[in-house]
A protein has these predicted regions:
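Cleavable N-terminal export/targeting peptides
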Residues: 1-43
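Short glycine/proline- and aromatic-enriched beta-strand/turn motifs that initiate or cap beta-hairpins
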Residues: 31-90
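Repeated loop/turn-to-beta-strand initiation elements of outer-membrane beta-barrel proteins
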Residues: 44-46, 78-84, 109-115, 142-148, ...
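Outer-membrane beta-barrel translocator/channel fold
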Residues: 57, 88-98, 117-132, 153-159, ...
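Residues on the lipid-exposed face of transmembrane beta-strands in outer-membrane beta-barrel proteins
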Residues: 70-74, 101-105, 134-140, 164-168
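Mid-chain, structured segments of secreted extracytoplasmic proteins
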Residues: 81-116
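Surface-exposed, polar helix/loop patches in the mature regions of secreted/periplasmic/lumenal proteins
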Residues: 106-147
């Protein structure tokens, strides 16, 4: 499922809901909404999606499992937003997740910077990495309804994240994407 709800300054809420067919790709596939690079004061956006996760660590590999993926973003002012994200990282034998809170700043129509805090937790090793992180989001139109996007970040605890994919604008308030996300962190 992918849901995008945008609440503009006039307090009217447009809700769109679409059921997605299963997307079969190798690695971590993400189905949700395309990352934002522009913000208008007072807007709130909710992105809900699914991710198929495969875990690898020191010769260990756990099979794919579908997970919840979601973000809520609120524009504090034009070009500046705060975002909370939850990313399920569960695989067949490992229960993990990443939660993050970031401040996002628009650089241009196609680029934004983000920085904040991330928490990567794994039940398998009973450990949590609390990380400071920074990164960049890029997005470009490939046509009137299709975007290509990328997101890359680095953080403490030898953490790197990147994501890339394509987004399709179904309506003014709904877009759907399919992409690949990579998360790597030090298991301490």
């Amino acid at each position: 499922m992918c849901v995008r709800v945008i609440n503009g300054g006039n307090n009217t809420m447009n809700k769109k809901l679409v059921a997605l067919l299963a997307v079969a790709t190798m690695g971590i596939s993400v189905v949700g909404a395309t990352p934002q690079t522009q913000f208008t004061k007072g807007e709130t956006q909710v992105d809900l999606g699914a991710a198929s996760v495969e875990t690898k660590a020191d010769g260990f590999k756990a099979a794919h499992k579908w997970n919840f993926d979601g973000d809520i973003t609120h524009a504090l002012r034009d070009k500046t937003a705060i975002q909370y994200g939850y990313h399920g990282l569960n695989s067949k034998h490992v229960d993990s997740n990443m939660q993050e809170v970031n401040l996002i700043q628009t650089l241009s129509k196609n680029f934004a910077l983000y920085g904040g805090w991330g928490r990567i937790h794994s039940d398998a090793i009973k450990h949590t990495n609390n990380i400071a992180q920074v990164g960049i989001i890029g997005k470009a139109a490939l046509g009137s309804k299709v975007d290509v996007y990328g997101k890359a970040g680095i953080g403490t605890k030898e953490t790197t994240t990147w994501e890339a994919g394509l987004g399709y604008k179904a309506t003014d308030d709904l877009d759907i994407n399919a992409g690949y996300r990579y998360v790597n962190t030090k298991a301490t």
